[in-house]
């Protein structure tokens, strides 16, 4: 999520000087999507940022925020936004208390780690939450810069918002899996002359036929 959002902001004219990436996969994505950025520890990125994007799993967000606040890594006036769907700005309270302007900016889409993420991000809705109209204006501007559509979500409704998206997504995944299985069965058998064989490889014939209908 982080490298995709960073690349989208960079395309909009922001300078992404640094990223924090721990896993080999995330470091590789950062190197490809943000080749001019330095990979640094989170505290160093935070200390030098005017806009700090926290794109970590929901279960790790509170710990990261607490650590950054304890280390005094975020300067007053820094815009800090997280990409979690389940959390509003309450989880960022330790940084708000230190003078940061905090936002929740959640892209409502599934990330695959592939190039298509960037294209889909430009057409995604973003659930945004802020403390006041100034915060909402900044969040909306950031989302629009990335090509997305900002949608306001009240702080007290973030849990319901996330649950609704997860519920819908899980059912859609089940439906798509079932549809792919049925389509593969319908297309299997002796191959027609010149037609690609039907298999379960990613981006196979069944996936390509279903994609325009499911998107």
Which residues does each predicted region cover?
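Short, solvent-exposed amphipathic alpha-helical segments in soluble enzyme
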Residues: 10, 69-71, 97, 142-145
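Conserved SAM-binding loop
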Residues: 19, 53-54, 128
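Rossmann-like NAD(P)(H) cofactor-binding subdomain of soluble oxidoreductases
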Residues: 24, 38-116
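Internal alpha-helical scaffold of NAD(P)-dependent oxidoreductase catalytic cores
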Residues: 29-33, 95, 116-215
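Primarily hydrophobic membrane-targeting regions of prokaryotic envelope proteins
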Residues: 1, 51-54, 165
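Phosphate- and divalent-cation-binding pockets in alpha/beta enzyme and binding domains
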Residues: 4, 29, 63-64, 90-91, ...
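NAD(P)+-binding Rossmann beta1-loop-alpha1 motif at the extreme N-terminus of oxidoreductases
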Residues: 1-47
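Short phosphate-binding/catalytic loops that engage adenosine nucleotides
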Residues: 14-15, 100, 148, 188
């Amino acid at each position: 999520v982080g490298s995709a959002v960073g690349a989208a902001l960079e395309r909009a004219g922001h300078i992404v000087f640094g990223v924090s990436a721990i896993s080999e996969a995330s470091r590789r994505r950062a190197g490809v999507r943000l080749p001019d950025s330095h990979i640094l520890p989170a505290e160093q990125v935070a200390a030098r940022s005017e806009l700090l994007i926290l794109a970590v799993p929901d279960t790790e967000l509170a710990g990261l925020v607490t650590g950054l606040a304890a280390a005094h890594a975020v300067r007053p006036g820094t815009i800090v936004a997280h990409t979690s769907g389940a959390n509003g700005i309450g989880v960022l309270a330790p940084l708000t208390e230190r003078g940061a302007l905090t936002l929740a900016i959640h892209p409502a889409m599934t990330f695959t780690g592939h190039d298509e993420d960037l294209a889909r991000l430009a057409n995604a809705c973003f659930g945004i939450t802020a403390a006041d109209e100034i915060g909402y204006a900044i969040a909306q501007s950031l989302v629009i810069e990335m090509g997305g559509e900002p949608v306001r979500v009240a702080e007290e409704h973030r849990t319901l918002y996330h649950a609704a998206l997860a519920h819908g997504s899980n059912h859609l995944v089940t439906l798509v899996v079932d549809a792919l299985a049925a389509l593969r069965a319908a297309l299997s058998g002796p191959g027609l002359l010149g037609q690609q064989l039907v298999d379960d490889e990613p981006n196979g014939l069944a996936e390509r036929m279903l994609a325009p209908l499911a998107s």
